[in-house]
Amino acid sequence: MVSGDVGVVVYYLLLVLVVVQGCKGSSAVQGEGRWYNESEAIGGAAAWGNAKATWYGQPNGAGAADNGGACGFKKVNQYPFMGMTSCGNQPLYKGGKGCGSCYRVRCNRNPACSGNAQTVAITDMNYFPLSQYHFDLSGIAFGRLAKPGRADDLRRAGIIDVQFARVPCEFPGLKVGFHVEEGSSPVYLAVLVEYENGDGDVAQVDLKEAGAGGGRWTPMRESWGSVWRLDSNHRLRAPFSIRIRSDSGKTLVAPDVIPLNWTPNTFYRSFVQYSS
């Protein structure tokens, strides 16, 4: 077999791996949501870049079987994500700091493409990139790029060329939320941060204790995805205030968001949100 034939075989084996395995498994989808600002892009007018797109999971699924993937977000098939999610390779996932960021994606080179842009959020890691920027979309998000009645035709293409642009996220009716992760204890706290308007991502999280420890912000460490943790040498004193900083440097403080009687595996919604 000549080298050219070997290259073709390797390409199609990779295609099968990406399309069939993708990031993870699948989950059901219910309805539609709108949680982005389609009138503007981060930094001004939309700057469209080129990327490859594939899809994974079920044809009408939200992607990850565990409802979250490498970012840790829960129930991405429900509001506000409504299954419009994507795995991103490293330039998009950014080692977890890209989790929650929003992108407009469109395609027009395949006959089944509508050319209409759809917005997806980065909720998982793409381990098999095919280009510098690679969106491994949920089945439903990939299908939304197609003309009416052509979603299955587009999915059968497997790999398509797309254009993308970063846009602000908007989560109508939601405040920034903090999910205290399983395994948290009086000396260890891990929280998942989600639903941030604007950048949508988190670059740094700090915690302030009550009582004697109050008044001093302690940096938390990124554990994985959008989960941040604090390993303490003393019993942490609740309630906890949390300060988050976005990739663009915007800060937001959620005072006493985690109460005195907090418990692991519990979601706590704040009363604060980034302005649109």
UniProtKB/Swiss-Prot annotation:
GO terms for biological process: plant-type cell wall loosening; sexual reproduction. Residues 68-174 form the Expansin-like EG45 domain. It comes from the Eukaryota. It is a peripheral membrane protein. Keywords: Cell wall, Cell wall biogenesis/degradation, Disulfide bond, Glycoprotein, Membrane, Secreted, Signal. Residues 187-270 form the Expansin-like CBD domain. GO terms for cellular component: extracellular region; membrane. Glycans are attached at N37. SUPFAM superfamilies: Barwin-like endoglucanases, PHL pollen allergen. Belongs to the expansin family. Expansin B subfamily. PANTHER family: EXPANSIN-B3 (PTHR31692), EXPANSIN-B8 (PTHR31692:SF20). This is Expansin-B8.
